[in-house]
Amino acid sequence: MMAGEKGIPFILHIPMEAKRYVGDKNALVRVGMPPDLIRMSVRNAFWSLPGAVGVNNHQGSHATEDLRAMEAVMKELAAEGVFFLDSRTSGSSIAYSVALEKDVPAARNQVFLDHYDEGGFIWSQFEKAFAIARRNGGVIAICHARPGTLDFLPRLYEIAPEDIKFVTVPEYLEHKRIGSWEE
């Protein structure tokens, strides 16, 4: 059974052109593509997996720095009525700011949890995320479906501090919008 069928919100992980793979034909969003083609690629991604509540970028260090590409992506996301989560694969990404300019709800990744697929590293990244959440009232942290990560995540609820609440990205964005957590 798919996440959407269980009522679990899910997002599309859209391949975008990376600096180290410039010209990669597998990227749905590439610098230099006509805006209409970018919009069609994003629209087709939604048609292929209906029910997605948002999008984040897979790779995309090149594409997320390009204004024309990001404007086309955000125009389509606005039409779909979904959010954008900037994976922050580039410190120079403009995706988040373009999303906000286009009235697309948006958030930014703040912690990569599993740059190394090893439990000790993943836990240290969670501790970093917990500290940011306590300081800022919330944090976005992302990970991959890697063996070490998938082994670690089920144990997280048992070992996480009691003052930490895990929420979905839509819940995070709602908190950001209204400025407080709904109990």
Residues covered by each model-derived region:
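Glycine-enriched alpha-helix->loop->beta-strand junction motifs that scaffold or abut catalytic
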Residues: 6-8, 74-83, 100-107
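Active-site groove signature of glycoside hydrolases
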Residues: 40-63, 136-138, 142
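Hydrophobic faces of well-ordered beta-strands that scaffold small-molecule active sites
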Residues: 10-14, 53-57, 84-87, 106-109, ...
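C-terminal domain-boundary segment and adjacent tail
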Residues: 77-91, 145-183
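Basic- and aromatic-lined ligand-binding clefts that recognize polyanionic substrates
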Residues: 56-80, 85-88
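Active-site beta->alpha N-cap acidic-glycine motif
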Residues: 1-26
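Solvent-exposed loop/turn segments at secondary-structure junctions
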Residues: 16-20, 60-64, 90-92, 112-115, ...
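Alpha-helical scaffold elements lining the catalytic groove of polysaccharide deacetylases
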Residues: 24-47, 63-69, 96-133
